[in-house]
Amino acid sequence: MAMAIALRRLSATVDKPVKSLYNGGSLYYMSSLPNEAVYDKEKSGVAWPKQLNAPLEVVDPEIADIIEHEKARQWKGLELIPSENFTSVSVMQAVGSVMTNKYSEGYPGARYYGGNEYIDMAETLCQKRALEAFRLDPAKWGVNVQPLSGSPANFQVYTALLKPHERIMALDLPHGGHLSHGYQTDTKKISAVSIFFETMPYRLDESTGYIDYDQLEKSATLFRPKLIVAGASAYARLYDYDRIRKVCNKQKAILLADMAHISGLVAAGVIPSPFDYADVVTTTTHKSLRGPRGAMIFYRKGVKEVNKQGKEVFYDYEDKINQAVFPGLQGGPHNHTITGLAVALKQATTPEYRAYQEQVLSNSSKFAQALGEKGYELVSGGTDNHLVLVNMKNKGIDGSRVEKVLEAVHIAANKNTVPGDVSAMVPGGIRMGTPALTSRGFLEEDFVKVADFFDAAVKIAVKVKAETQGTKLKDFVATLESSAPIKSEIAKLRHDVEEYAKQFPTIGFEKETMKYKN
């Protein structure tokens, strides 16, 4: 907490940007590119190198302009989507480097292409740092850093360790789960996972908003799953990994912990780790972990147990998972992403990173408190992690309509199902989180102000709904966009939001280089 305050004060006192990082709006490494005269002199008959080394704003001003608009959106708005974050300049430099040029099917030391000396070094270093970031013994844990994203990583685990149509249990999507855990309705298999495997959900106790572990255990006894997923995308409480481990032991099931949302908190040691209980752990790398867009699969290795004959039995996950990633479901890995991930994992072991994650939790707790004081109903009554899930039903409005108003005033949040919902398209909740704004330096009292902005937006949404003639979402949007008094309220709130957001540092680019600062 104290470190977070100090860092924020430090950022506020910086008058001038660090010029060494940028050169006229482009990243510094662009300044080392060959100039036009070199190519005119050495290769007068070859035209394309000149184009290849030209900066983006010259080659494609349309895309450059879109990027500038996105910079302005990130600077002027409030980013509350809990699965999003602002990655660092150093990570973006690695992701935008020459590491993107290389093909490297296979694994370090066993590639199907030549010229991978430095690619192997980067991937091996990334693996080493991944284990270090989560304080894992390399004799007991291994990691694959090649998965392209979280959903593919989960599917790679299923195909590695399960036979077709074997059984998976996971948290139901309307109760906070994720599509990649095998979601299906009574009439349709929504996720491809549910096509290739048999899936059964466990759910929340709707009276408390917590996972119903007693019912989970009863369902597992009847369903006899081969794998149980402990992970969520909209669950504001901590998982009882010990309880699920005991269920897995009874069913001789694999425990897969999907920590995509919370891996940054786990790395910092500010919430309990799933590694003490899980057989396999997956995570994305771009949420609370604050790296590039990718994923990792951690798996147990070494001695699993000693059998009745006194012989050691070893985990057999490593080869199965590696083969499922490549060549099973992927070709060449994205080496620029792996390189950027290595940088992010190094950052995850620093004191600044722990201070940041502590602040994420403090901000989330304060945000939940402020919302509760304004009469908002939180699923489970609060939060233990980086997110809050607000049930809007007691306000007479749904998440879809509130999301539209939030978007209009430059607050990015997302509609989300809550227990009891019957429609995923018009759900009753709004999901919000603190990682992104905490990266910009927001502290507890700033999230009290964010709660004020949210409350003002909800009141506008309720007013728009009352003035709307039709019952469909498009009718609501039409009123939102056509009513002069409503448009005036929206404009005022948007101005207030922007003026507040603009007080805080930009992340990944410098304000002085922006095209759209007003």
Curated annotation (Swiss-Prot):
GO molecular function, a single term: pyridoxal phosphate binding
Function: Catalyzes the interconversion of serine and glycine.
Assigned GO CC terms: cytoplasm; cytosol; mitochondrion; stromule
Subunit text: Homotetramer.
Pathway annotation from the record: One-carbon metabolism; tetrahydrofolate interconversion
Protein name per Swiss-Prot or TrEMBL: Serine hydroxymethyltransferase, mitochondrial
Cofactor: pyridoxal 5'-phosphate
Signal peptide as annotated in the record: none
Organism: Solanum tuberosum (Potato)
InterPro entries per record: PyrdxlP-dep_Trfase (IPR015424), PyrdxlP-dep_Trfase_major (IPR015421), PyrdxlP-dep_Trfase_small (IPR015422), Ser_HO-MeTrfase (IPR001085), Ser_HO-MeTrfase-like (IPR049943), Ser_HO-MeTrfase_PLP_BS (IPR019798), SHMT-like_dom (IPR039429)
Keyword Mitochondrion applies: yes
Residues that bear N6-(pyridoxal phosphate)lysine: 287
Domain of life of the organism encoding this protein: Eukaryota
Keywords: Mitochondrion, One-carbon metabolism, Pyridoxal phosphate, Transferase, Transit peptide
Record's subcellular location: Mitochondrion
Enzyme Commission (EC) number: 2.1.2.1
Reactions this protein catalyses: (6R)-5,10-methylene-5,6,7,8-tetrahydrofolate + glycine + H2O = (6S)-5,6,7,8-tetrahydrofolate + L-serine
UniProt cross-references to Pfam families, sorted A to Z: SHMT
Chief place of localization: mitochondrion
BP terms from Gene Ontology: circadian rhythm; glycine biosynthetic process from serine; photorespiration; response to cold; response to light stimulus; tetrahydrofolate interconversion; tetrahydrofolate metabolic process
Transit peptide start and end: 1-31
Entry similarity comment: Belongs to the SHMT family.
